[in-house]
Amino acid sequence: MTNPPSTDYSRAGAGLRIGVLALQGDFREHLRAAEATGATGIGIRRPSELDGIDGLIIPGGESTAIDKLARAFELADPLRKLIAEGLPVYGSCAGMILLADEIADPATDLAGNPQQTFGGLDITVRRNAFGRQRESFEIDLEFKGLGFSDTGSGVAPVHAVFIRGPWVERVGPGVEVLAQVEPADPAHASHAAALQGTARIVAVRSGHLLATSFHPEVTGEKRVHELFIRMIRGEA
């Protein structure tokens, strides 16, 4: 039986060391979000900084750049090892791509080699699925497993920001779908055509791994990070 979600976000992460992969992207926002829970946030740029962390966040940004930099800084293999060993990891946007076992449309380098991922999530993702930067959008989503809203009015939808976000095209049998964008949602012109009448998966969990297509760190939405804290503590 899991413990109920806490409403005291400022203490939820007390005593935990949360690493944030700080090679590229919006890692500063994730560090602030982790520290807002009372955790110690640690920017990860070299393998030695992985020692002693309780969980890791892979931020949004450019998945191809993070992939190349992780290999250049000799972080890719240590990260794969930690993920395989059960380290709790949360990936947002590019982080979702990097946690996926498969990319439907991988980028390639000049030699034609496809981008690599750290893997761990039995999912197939499509990069930039909702369109380009100018087609970014915001929407309210129902999200399974979150704590109560700050207003105390019950579990409120997540206000999600999508910035060149991926979506999940396939989930394996051990993957739980936490949120999806529905065709019946408000018809933002920026993503209505992309949906083509099909619900698109934008948040998933499999055991110790959590991923979202969107960016809770840029909206002040605390509950996704709080869910990750509860996962680290074994409470969710």
Swiss-Prot record:
Its EC number is 4.3.3.6, 3.5.1.2. InterPro entries: Class_I_gatase-like, PdxT/SNO, PdxT/SNO_CS. Pathway: Cofactor biosynthesis; pyridoxal 5'-phosphate biosynthesis. It catalyses: aldehydo-D-ribose 5-phosphate + D-glyceraldehyde 3-phosphate + L-glutamine = pyridoxal 5'-phosphate + L-glutamate + phosphate + 3 H2O + H(+); L-glutamine + H2O = L-glutamate + NH4(+). Keywords: Glutamine amidotransferase, Hydrolase, Lyase, Pyridoxal phosphate. It comes from the Bacteria. SUPFAM superfamilies: Class I glutamine amidotransferase-like (SSF52317). GO terms for cellular component: cytosol; glutaminase complex. L-glutamine binds at residues 61-63, 127, 163-164. One of its GO terms (molecular function) is glutaminase activity. It holds the Pfam family SNO. Catalyzes the hydrolysis of glutamine to glutamate and ammonia as part of the biosynthesis of pyridoxal 5'-phosphate. The resulting ammonia molecule is channeled to the active site of PdxS. NCBIfam families: PLP_synth_Pdx2 (TIGR03800). In the presence of PdxS, forms a dodecamer of heterodimers. Only shows activity in the heterodimer. This is Pyridoxal 5'-phosphate synthase subunit PdxT. The lineage of its organism: Bacteria, Bacillati, Actinomycetota, Actinomycetes, Micrococcales.
